[in-house]
Amino acid sequence: MFKIALDLMPSDSHKIIIRADKTPAGKHTRRFNSPTIDEVAVIIVGENLQSRDIVLHRRNSDLKRVSETHRSYDALQYPLIFWQGEDGYHFNIKMVNEVTAPLLAVFVLAPESPPRISEEMTRSNDLVFCNLHTRSPVLKPTKKVSAMNFYSYRLMIRQGEVNHILMCQRLFHQFAVDMYVKIETERLTYIRLNQRQLRSEEYIHLRDAINADGNVNNVGRMTILPATYIGSPCHMHEYAQGAMSYVRHYGRPDLFVTFTCNPKWSEIKRELLHSQTPVDRHDITARVFKQRLKSLMNFLLKHCVYGRVRCWMYSVEWQKRGLPHAHILVWLVHKIRPDQIDSIISAEIPDETVDPKLHAVVTKHMIHGPCGLFNYNSPCMVDGKCSKRYPRDLLAETITGNDGHPLYRRRSVADNGRSVVVKVRGQNVDVANRWIMPYSPILSKVFETHINVEYCNSVKSIKYICKYVNKGSDMAVFAVTNANDEISQYQMGRYVSSNEAFWRIFSFAIHERHPTVVHLAVHLENGQRVYFNESNAADRAARPPSTTLTSFCQTDDFARTLLYADVPRNYTWNASSKSFQRRKQGTPVEGHPNVFSSDALGRIYTVHPNNDECYYLRLLLVNVRAPISFKQLRTVNGQLCATYREACQLLHLLENDSHWMIRSRIP
């Protein structure tokens, strides 16, 4: 056995206090909610994960530091799970080709029929595998297994095998969040180590440095977390801007759907082991919710229950509530009219005699609270009031206001409305329609869970909704207190629950959308961003990299009829050749043979007005078709302008105060 070094050191008992009332300025308050359930979670402090200080007390009383990626870490940290001391994840696990894996065997397993091995293979130190059917040699795989692949493999359910990890209840949850932190540490370590070598700078500055003295040590800056890193600020900002691209092209979304996991789904109960409850198996709830979410999207997109869908997007969240839920935005080809709302969305208790199944689902999943006088300890209560504005007013008809929040029909009992008796804190409470959350009868009946469906009425609410859907990972403001409850300082960290850890270990998507949004670069001439290191700086300076903007200026005749943001509809961006290529599939464009159109959208990166020349360049790209060069963009009616701002003024793209000056001179 072993001892953790911390056990040998006298220390006060500490506890972590999470404060939901302390939200950093500029951050979405929902990211900092207090946990509403008892769950296992980890709080990651800081933007970048650092190596943990893991110290063991050896038998000879020496202290030894162990990395979380050491092959023995899992067995040392979780001896109850890995009592045989089996190896955990480490960097040198080789990946076997998934196609040929069933046919591979080490040579010594079949000595009576040796494979044909060349002299070169014999001289090498590589272990040789052979195909059992052809007896032809196959060299040892060189690709390594990632931490995410390894732990996803360990959590799998296999027929005929007993995976004892799945039986460890809360220790299982702790193992999951611990291993997810290890996965994130590996990814961030890779980015951090590569960024020490990789630098970025505008091309013109790199070229000047190379031409001057060839020293690039003082040129450029370290790169930051890329937008491809899920959950990074850049990633969430791009998704929010992508949602606004849908709004610019197709107007407001029609429906805002919140789909929540139901732990009592039959698929979850069926997969539980003996004496287990859904609380013990967050891995199953993650898998089932993923499949149910897929079914819901198919229900909306393929079966077109509300009409043909033009575009959609969703984000999966937890918000410290335990079970996952998805926020979905749906744009329809034919917009929902106000007189159609009542046929799609209801905020009333259904008639039990007409539809007993729907009545059971609504009364079980779609009643808010009740809170207020019935339960002041409800999570929705803030300063003595319900933050969700319940109970709502009773209305005979649905009203679509101008603030973006429609008021749904909620009839009173005297006006053919209904009520139901529910238990709240041991007391019977008569609940009427004013406590019902808006729902779609067909979705509630099919999926038997909490599905809140809202009609998006006004453009005023769209910006908030788009930011809400893409607000980012859960966060927590917390403090560590000692035995005397003394708080030294508050800290902010990322909050990862065991439910989220399983979801991410299984590589399930956090965000999905359709159609794709292609990001289009905008920069001044020779101002494109260049990524380089010391070994390739000269080559990068000699050959400036192509961007979507420079490639747009070099495309064919049909592209010269398009605006910059419209190019992705008819062209795909080839990342390897750095060029636009015509689409080979899609809807044929009339009058243009071999030209096809798709539903892809283009989004030109935003530019701050303080960067004035680049800002005016972007304004020209939004309005001017088919520029063949930066020089032509500054040419208006044959006149070459000195600046892009001057070109914008000649094209009347800017407001001018000169007419006010002229009027002020008139007596």
Task: Describe each model-derived feature in a short phrase.
Residues 1-667:
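Extended, structured polyanion-binding interfaces
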